[in-house]
Amino acid sequence: MIRTLLMLTFWALAAPLAALIGFPASFIMGDVRVLYRLFMWGAWAGVWVTGVRVETVGLDQFDHSRSYIFMTNHVSNIDPPIQIPLIPRRTSVMVKKELFKFPILGRAMRMGSLVPVDRSNRDAGIEAVRAAKSVIEQGLNMAIYVEGKRSFDGKLLPFKKGPFYLAVECGVPVIPVTIVGTHYIMPKARFAIKPGLVKVIFHPPIEPQDFGDRESLMEKVRAAVESGLPEEFRHPASARADVRGKGTEAPEGTAYA
């Protein structure tokens, strides 16, 4: 609990400082990258002070000048502040609309082109996918936690179909990502953070010409993400078809759950 409070206190102190520097600099320069980098540094540093250390795999195997959709598993609230700062270029995410109500955070997220999503409203989910498409067309990356919510036991949940609709519509490469370790550090049912090692695996990009249809792309992403999980978090072969077959129909996606 102390480590969690330390992280939250650090963020509470760092956010106004980042805003004090980043907002004027962004307005003067007409570029939000200063603000973005400050907030990414703050997110990373906040995780670091808790004793969490991160190992990355595969960051050197894709072109950092291109836009990608990163499709990632989700087991902990600490996943986004670990993953997003690792990605070299500006990256947007879909986040709960409630987070936009916080004055400094909400303003920064709007300037950073983050996409609000209302998970209780199917039509709002569709609108969020359209907004995400617009963000990608601006040249930004998009990170999506394709299960739509956190997994309680660390195993993959059914994937939302919206992210795959988005990928096919935009025609940009998809990078499957596996996050390993946050289930132990801060699982869904616990607020306290334990120190430990997190591994973030960036799998090889899936190029648009290799997508096939949306179902085929979903299968490829799921296979890649699951391949990076420890054996105890992989579904038995006999159960995989059932899990894959339960994907929701609405185009949805959210970064936090």
Predicted feature residues:
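Short, hinge-like loop/turn segments at secondary-structure boundaries
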Residues: N73-H74, R110-G112, A192-P195
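Non-catalytic C-terminal accessory region of glycerolipid acyltransferases
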Residues: I126-A257
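A transmembrane-helix-recognition feature enriched in membrane-embedded lipid enzymes
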Residues: M1-E55, R107-M111
